[in-house]
Amino acid sequence: MGDMMQNRLYAVAATFSVLPVVFVGLRLWARRVKRVKLGWDDFTIMFALVRSSSYLGSLNRARCLFNATVLRIAVSHKTDTAVGGLGKASKTNADGIPIYDNTYWTHMKVSFGNRLSQVLAIGPTKMSVLFFYRRIFGNSGRTIFDNASMVLMIICAAWTVAYFFGNLFHYMPIKMLWTVTADKLPAPNKQLYLTQCYIDIATDALIISLPIPITFDPDPDFQTYYLATITYWTLIEAGLGIIAACLPLLVPIVRKMSWVLTPRSGQDDIPLNPKNPSPPS
């Protein structure tokens, strides 16, 4: 059973070390195809990608090899699975008492790093989507939408900062996590974790539903309406969130490839930026 679980963890590490990088790369290629300048939605998703790599990268003790690269995702996750005992039952002696060895301390360091990096991966992903919404629908006279999206951005930024430092200073001194055995650690603050999750889920739901009223506008701009329909991806947590945030921007690449097989029509190219449309590339 332990080997099966570890194999699954290896598969997860391999998958999410590649897919987010590929989709962010395609996103940037789409920007180049459409000759659209990078915006804050692009910068925040790239930051989220780096932090997502650190989320699993914090599992890696071989930081000298992959300290600043997204390749840390797979290598680090595999390192913790092999060295930190991830996916295996905790070691105990003949009396069932836990054994606190280097494997245990490695895992505790990993868990601490995960909590910090996860917040820094999820928060910027949320903000990237909100920046993308404002790129499409902003400056269009929709005061309610502008105000609502700005309030959500402030909430997401505050959530990121508050829970980063909340997790950072949960135990003081910090090194207590990997120097004190579990039976001597203070009880964790469940309210901290529960409120973090509740606000996380609530902001996800609000972000997903934010553009829906605009799509039911009785007289929408055609280009804006078309782009809105491809933004409803549940870009939630680190890896899948990054992929989902990039998907709406890959239309130019798909169309560019489809032109090889089908002739162009006069209306088959929808600009990514309705305020600054560019001719087909």
Curated annotation (Swiss-Prot):
It is found in: Membrane. Its main location: membrane. InterPro entries: Rhodopsin_dom_fungi (IPR049326), SAT4-like (IPR052337). This is Phomoidride biosynthesis cluster protein H. It comes from Fungal sp. (strain ATCC 74256). Keywords: Glycoprotein, Membrane, Transmembrane, Transmembrane helix. PANTHER family: INTEGRAL MEMBRANE PROTEIN, PTH11-LIKE INTEGRAL MEMBRANE PROTEIN (AFU_ORTHOLOGUE AFUA_5G11245). It comes from the Eukaryota. Part of the gene cluster that mediates the biosynthesis of the antihypercholesterolemic agents phomoidrides which are dimeric anhydrides. The function of phiH within the pathway has still to be determined. The pathway begins with the highly reducing polyketide synthase phiA that catalyzes the formation of a C12-fatty acyl-ACP, starting from one acetate and 5 malonate units. The hydrolase phiM is involved in the release of the C12-fatty acyl chain from phiA. Belongs to the SAT4 family. It is a multi-pass membrane protein. The chain crosses the membrane at residues 9-29, 149-169, 196-216, 234-254. Phomoidrides A and B (also known as CP-225,917 and CP-263,114) are potent inhibitors of Ras farnesyltransferase and squalene synthase. CP-225,917 and CP-263,114 inhibit Ras farnesyl transferase from rat brain with IC(50) values of 6 uM and 20 uoM, respectively. CP-225,917 inhibits squalene synthase with an IC(50) value of 43 uM and CP-263,114 with an IC(50) of 160 uM. GO terms for cellular component: membrane. Glycans are attached at N67, N147. Pfam families: Fung_rhodopsin (PF20684). The gene is phiH.
